[in-house]
Design a protein with these regions (language model features):
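Histidine- and aromatic-rich ligand-binding microenvironments
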Residues: 6-7, 40, 101-102, 123
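Short, flexible helix/strand-to-coil boundary loops that buttress conserved ligand/catalytic motifs
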Residues: 15-18, 51, 96, 131
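Active-site neighborhoods of divalent-metal-dependent phosphate/nucleic-acid chemistry enzymes
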Residues: 3, 49-52, 74-120
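A generic structural signal for short hydrophobic patches within well-formed alpha-helices
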Residues: 11, 44-47, 89, 127
Length: 140
């Protein structure tokens, strides 16, 4: 059964309350078993960074965001947060020759490749020269 690695933008979209989340993304996610959804420690890093920034600039909103993040990390994705391994590093290095890929994207792509997963993201262009299956639920 196919498994899916969520890019940070998918998690951020699903966090939106009420009808603010894109209906295509919600429908795509609801059509599959949540146990098939994974995130990378890189996504965890990006989310934690956002929470820390919000806590600094708006403590009340930061507290709400922190509670959401802890629940996401400790319950929603418990057992489905993928680490960076030596294999991930080797794959990521190969993704950066001859074309360099900036920041977190190549780490997330390498994690998807290592674990034979489809990468679910809105940022298709960021992964255009990487041999990984991309799914854009905004376009589904």
């Amino acid at each position: 059964m196919k498994k899916y690695l969520f890019d940070t933008n998918v998690i951020s979209e699903l966090r939106k309350r009420g009808d603010r989340a894109d209906p295509n993304v919600v429908a795509w996610c609801n059509a599959r078993d949540y146990d098939l959804y994974y995130i990378s420690v890189v996504t965890l890093f990006e989310l934690e960074l956002g929470v820390l920034q919000k806590e600094r600039t708006d403590p009340a909103q930061g507290e709400l965001l922190r509670k959401w993040f802890v629940n996401l990390r400790d319950k929603v994705f418990k057992g489905r947060i993928l680490p960076i391994t030596s294999t991930t590093a080797t794959i990521n290095a190969s993704l950066n020759v001859p074309d360099r890929h900036q920041g977190a994207d190549s780490w997330i792509a390498a994690t998807a490749i290592e674990n034979k997963m489809a990468l679910v993201t809105r940022n298709v262009k960021d992964f255009q020269n990487i041999q990984v299956e991309i799914i854009n639920p905004w376009d589904c």
